[in-house]
């Protein structure tokens, strides 16, 4: 998987068309109203639903106010630079409420749980789970077969563009409510205890805990048993 360069992300945001998409429920004498091709109009003579840019739909509503009895607007963003990721072709389990921006890489059989937030440029490896309410900032990278616990934060780095992003290597377990600061690498097979604040690189196959996090021991069989990654949670339906 390719990590986006910070300057690529900055350029994408700068050049993107800022959008305020809306969904509008409308009723009235709609046979008298003409809708442009740039607005998706699913209407009959008396009612319907519109999808499009707010500035354009507002103009339609204002210019046809004598024909429109009532309308309700649904709107969840304003001048948004980054669309949501199109999830339909992704071979992963993504639960309702996850917020995933465009230009995020998600490996096969990954799991993204409810209300996780994943920003532009983040990378999630095959078979990794991002648990409820976890946050992956811009360009944060998670390797294969990892678990990022509920409420954990992997700090994002888009500006300054020279800053190094968070990198979590393969087979890492990060506990609930952990904070990993910018520039930190968590080494392969490491375990970060719940609530830790990680300010420095974590050596491979070690357990760290505390604020700031410190190595408390090397991985042993007991730790492996307590932090086992269950592949059964990552299985998808067979393709048809």
UniProtKB/Swiss-Prot annotation:
PROSITE patterns: HEXAPEP_TRANSFERASES (PS00101). GO terms for molecular function: tetrahydrodipicolinate N-acetyltransferase activity. It catalyses: (S)-2,3,4,5-tetrahydrodipicolinate + acetyl-CoA + H2O = L-2-acetamido-6-oxoheptanedioate + CoA. Its EC number is 2.3.1.89. InterPro entries: DapH, DapH_N, Hexapep, Hexapep_transf_CS, Trans_hexapeptide_repeat, Trimer_LpxA-like_sf. It comes from the Bacteria. One of its GO terms (biological process) is diaminopimelate biosynthetic process. Keywords: Acyltransferase, Amino-acid biosynthesis, Diaminopimelate biosynthesis, Lysine biosynthesis, Repeat, Transferase. Signal peptide: none annotated. Pathway: Amino-acid biosynthesis; L-lysine biosynthesis via DAP pathway; LL-2,6-diaminopimelate from (S)-tetrahydrodipicolinate (acetylase route): step 1/3. HAMAP family: DapH (MF_01691). Catalyzes the transfer of an acetyl group from acetyl-CoA to tetrahydrodipicolinate. Belongs to the transferase hexapeptide repeat family. DapH subfamily. This is 2,3,4,5-tetrahydropyridine-2,6-dicarboxylate N-acetyltransferase. It comes from Bacillus cereus (strain AH187). The lineage of its organism: Bacteria, Bacillati, Bacillota, Bacilli, Bacillales.
